[in-house]
Every structure is written in structure tokens, then in C-alpha cells.
């Protein structure tokens, strides 16, 4: 086929998976002909795999406060947050700290 793919892994934990069809781990093959950053990834996720209550995951163009984002086990705040450019085989983990009581 010859189309370039950017393969990454998404993981959801501590309740975040409930917003994504209760699937804790997804392997994605994104269009490798464009540059992907976290901002683009969040838009793609909203359009393609976010199945429940997007307001619990997204706030504007970013994740809600209370959603931790780790890229290859590193806090995304150290990597540039929305501007981080995804690399092949990156692992992006979303952890919800929002729990009812």
C-alpha cells in the first residue's frame, strides 16, 4: 500500500476507559503523512473513539483538569503538553483522577 503510518498506543486507566467504550488499550495507526501532536490527537480521539460524555474528558481543546497525561511514562507537562509531537511507538496514557463520592 505504501502509505506511511504513525503507530502509537493509547491507554486509559482509573475510569478514563469508561469514556472510550471500556477499552483500556488501543493500538493506533495514524496517517503518517501529517505531523501529529497531542492537540491533533485529542481532536482525532473526540471524533473517532470518545463514546461517552466528552465533557468528562475534554475542556475546550485540551483535557479536563483531573485527567493526567503520561507520554512514555513522562508527565506531558514536561514535554510541551498539546505541542508535543508524537513519535513512532509512543505510549500515551490517560489517567482519571475524577472520582465520585
From Swiss-Prot:
Post-translational modification: C-terminal thiocarboxylation occurs in 2 steps, it is first acyl-adenylated (-COAMP) via the hesA/moeB/thiF part of the MOCS3 homolog, then thiocarboxylated (-COSH) via the rhodanese domain of the MOCS3 homolog.
Any Gene Ontology biological process: tRNA wobble uridine modification
UniProt-annotated location(s): Cytoplasm
Cross-referenced InterPro entries: Beta-grasp_dom_sf, Mopterin_synth/thiamin_S_b, Urm1
The protein's annotated pathway: tRNA modification; 5-methoxycarbonylmethyl-2-thiouridine-tRNA biosynthesis
Pfam family, one: Urm1
GO cellular component, one term: cytosol
Name of this protein: Ubiquitin-related modifier 1 homolog
Species whose genome carries this gene: Drosophila ananassae (Fruit fly)
Gene name in the database record: Urm1
